[in-house]
Amino acid sequence: MTTSPGTVESTTPVSGQLRTVLSAGERPARATAVSATLTHLWRAMMAFKHFPVQLIDIVLMPLIFLLMFTYLFGGAFADSTEEYLQFYLPGVTVQAVVMMTVYTGTSLNTDIHKGVFDRFRTLPFWQPATLAGSLLGDVLRYVVALATTVFLGLLLGFRADGGFLGVVGAMLVLIVFGFSVSWIFAALGVVASEPERVSGTSMIVLYPLLFMSNIFVMPETMPGWMQAIVDANPMSHAATASRELMHGTAGFWDVGLVLCVSAGLVAVFAPLTMRLYRNKNAH
């Protein structure tokens, strides 16, 4: 069956009519920096829905360390496992948050190598929102890790003399600290050649910092040269701030120092990460 030329002409839109149809509706406004960041924050949070196995790592890692060190080594590190739990639980919360920051770098690097960021680059929104939203989404990891660790500690007999406000205050300080550290691994995630490089390099950096701190044992049991490293280690001050807040003996020094270090890390690594990201996009 053939179509007559007249029918074709009557159903073929002319350019003027097409332009009128396309311009009739009002175009949506360009996304603001805040709305774009919130959109990518939502995308990061949806990763837990589509990849729930991440929650297993987030929950199990700090719980395994808490149980292992408390009941295997607690009696050797302190007079009893109960006494060591009072010392170690605020420290393991630091470890839980810092270890979660590695996910920031690996997830960013995975998105880059899958071409997700290339697709984002073609869209008309504030490009740094991709990084900012991802890092803010990782805050959920910190909250889950902290909440489950503290909850198990309370079940095991941990006594938070600082009360509810002390525990919440410690968690807030550690969330700020973790957010600042995550910018370091975000920068690494942008420049690394593959996700495995990010995780491998992160472990090489983190494990010495975690174990050469006062998270696991008191510095007085260490050699003098190591005590100097422990005293200068930001992880130690974060652990001390967490202990002071949870036990109700908080002073301004360690809490203030952790917040100042966090602000310094963001001031240095946030612009650096953004610049590396823009340079990568330019190529």
Swiss-Prot record:
Subunit text: The complex is probably composed of two ATP-binding proteins (DrrA1) and two transmembrane proteins (DrrB1).
GO-annotated biological processes: response to antibiotic
Protein keywords: Antibiotic resistance, Cell membrane, Membrane, Transmembrane, Transmembrane helix
MF terms (GO), sorted A to Z: ABC-type transporter activity
InterPro entries for the chain: ABC2_TM (IPR013525), ABC2_TM_bact-type (IPR047817), ABC_2_transport (IPR000412), T7SS_ABC-Transporter (IPR051328)
Protein family: Belongs to the ABC-2 integral membrane protein family.
TM ranges: 58-78, 85-105, 150-170, 171-191, 198-218, 252-272
Role: Part of the ABC transporter complex DrrA1B1 involved in daunorubicin efflux. Responsible for the translocation of the substrate across the membrane. Confers self-resistance to daunorubicin, an antibiotic produced by S.coeruleorubidus.
Residue intervals of the ABC transmembrane type-2 domain: 53-280
Protein's name in the database: Daunorubicin resistance ABC transporter permease protein DrrB1
Consequence of gene loss (knockout): Deletion of the drrA1-drrB1 operon decreases by 31% the daunorubicin (DNR) titer in cell culture. The drrA1-drrB1 mutant exhibits no growth defect compared with the wild-type strain and no significant change on DNR sensitivity. Deletion of the drrA1-drrB1, drrA2-drrB2 and drrA3-drrB3 operons almost blocks DNR production in cell culture, suggesting that disruption of these operons impairs the efflux of DNR, resulting in intracellular accumulation.
